[in-house]
């Protein structure tokens, strides 16, 4: 058994799709647009099984997202931080609780906490 995907119910599908593809750098593995029902995209890094599914329901739908953090490992946390600043995403400062660990947080369009971490 392995972790397959995390679903994020989004209020603004296009804004979330842009965040996860242009900022995070994920690829769209599957896209579905069912008029009067929903839009859905399955996103992952090239060649990876674990995915993030973003869904927007056309009918009223509420979801509570407090307490959720999604973490991405990256090879250059400073570059990701600069990209977040350049895109106006207002990231936290880079934190380094020990010399081999560096991370920061940014919120996605639905205010889900996204962490980017680099371990040397």
Description of each model-found segment:
Residues 46-50, 60-61, 77-78:
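Short, charged/polar surface micro-motifs in flexible loops or helix N-caps
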Residues 1-17, 68-70, 120:
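N-terminal beta-strand motif that seeds the catalytic metal site of vicinal oxygen chelate
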Residues 31, 81-120:
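Vicinal oxygen chelate
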Residues 12-13, 74-78:
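Helix N-cap motif at beta-to-alpha junctions
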Residues 7-49:
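Core segments of cupin and vicinal oxygen chelate
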Residues 19, 78-83:
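Short amphipathic alpha-helices within nucleic acid-binding modules
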Residues 40, 71, 103-104:
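Short hydrophobic/aromatic beta-strand element in the GNAT-like acyltransferase core
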Residues 1-2, 62-67, 97-98:
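Short glycine-enriched loop/turn motifs at secondary-structure junctions
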């Amino acid at each position: 058994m392995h972790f397959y995907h995390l679903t994020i119910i989004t209020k603004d599908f296009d804004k979330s799709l842009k965040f996860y593809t242009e900022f995070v750098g994920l690829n769209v593995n599957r896209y579905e647009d069912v008029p009067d029902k929903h839009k859905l995209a399955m996103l992952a890094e090239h060649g990876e099984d674990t995915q993030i599914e973003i869904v927007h329901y056309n009918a009223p739908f509420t979801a509570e997202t407090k307490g959720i953090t999604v973490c991405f490992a990256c090879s250059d946390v400073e570059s990701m931080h600069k990209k977040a600043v350049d895109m106006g995403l207002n990231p936290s400062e880079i934190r380094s609780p020990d010399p081999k660990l560096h991370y920061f947080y940014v919120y996605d369009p639905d205010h889900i906490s996204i962490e980017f971490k680099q371990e040397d």
